[in-house]
A protein has these predicted regions:
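Amide-forming acyltransferase catalytic core, primarily the GNAT-like/NAT-type
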Residues: 78-165
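Non-catalytic C-terminal interaction regions
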Residues: 180-226
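Conserved active-site alpha-helix within GNAT-family acetyltransferase domains
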Residues: 42, 66-84, 204-217
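A conserved beta-turn-beta hairpin within the catalytic core of GNAT-like acetyltransferases
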Residues: 17-26, 36, 160-172, 215-219
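Conserved acetyl-CoA-binding loop-helix of GNAT-fold acetyltransferases
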Residues: 28-31, 37-51, 73, 77, ...
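Conserved GNAT acetyl-CoA-binding A-motif
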Residues: 24, 45, 52-67, 74, ...
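Conserved beta-strand in the GNAT
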Residues: 2, 8-16, 25, 151-162
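Conserved catalytic-core motifs of GNAT/GCN5-like acyltransferases
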Residues: 17, 63-64, 81-94, 214-225
Length: 226
């Protein structure tokens, strides 16, 4: 969606609809600096929310960097709430010549293993509710990996090939008593698939000390009931 003034673009916004999850994802809000006090961003979001309601969407979500105070203030003003904080790390792929003990077999038998309200699948930097249907699809595609101790899952991750970043694999680190092994497994997997970059997204506040692991910046996942 683009708004023009005298045939010159002054603002834009993008949205993606997820009918199965009854969700709209809003991103890419840009407003020319000369028009930022005109309430254009709020009007664009409101228009998309109305469109989402007409499509039977029940929630609207967006992701905002923690240091972006103007966007956070606007989102809160129009009814969005922070539902979680996510940390972003980057790492290079690497050949790991050791037995790590990560598997994709029988990691998830049921969505009951998750807190449905707070579980997400990250696709192209969009946080999608992890429904039972979505979970089964990921499991069948062998994108869910885990480390077990006496048949109990102690580390859980979702690994996907990024559609947003070139030559990149995404590790969503869901939980981890020993996340180092999951990270090393992802490094090795990326190396095998000829990817050079890894992006790690997690609610965990810190990760093990691994060479070249860079802590980028945190984001807030915002949500509004429609």
């Amino acid at each position: 969606m683009v708004i023009e003034n005298d045939q010159i673009p002054i603002s834009m916004i993008h949205a993606a609809f997820y009918p199965d999850e009854k969700m709209i994802w809003i991103e890419g809000i840009r407003v020319d600096k000369n028009f930022r006090k005109n309430g254009i961003a709020q009007k664009m979001i409101s228009y998309l929310e109305k469109t989402a309601k007409s499509k039977n969407c029940k929630i609207s979500r967006m992701l905002i960097a923690s240091e972006n105070e103007p966007s956070l203030t606007l989102a809160k003003k129009i009814g969005y709430k922070i539902i979680s904080k996510w940390n972003y790390f980057s790492l290079e792929s690497k050949l790991i010549d050791e037995e790590i003990g990560i598997t994709s077999d029988t990691c998830i038998d049921s969505i009951d293993s998750f807190d449905k309200k707070n579980s997400h699948f990250i696709e192209s930097w969009r946080w999608i509710p992890l429904t039972d249907q979505r979970l089964k699809k990921l499991n069948s595609e062998k994108k869910i990996f885990c480390q077990k101790d006496n048949e109990k899952i102690i580390t859980l991750g979702i690994i996907t090939e990024s559609k947003s970043f070139e030559n990149t694999i995404i590790l969503e680190l869901v939980s981890g008593a020993n996340s180092e092994k999951m990270i090393k497994f992802t490094q090795n997997l990326a190396h095998q698939k000829n990817y050079s970059k890894i992006r790690i997204l997690t609610e965990l506040e810190s990760l093990p000390s691994i060479k070249n692991l860079e802590n980028k910046f945190p984001f807030y996942l915002m949500e509004k009931k429609l």
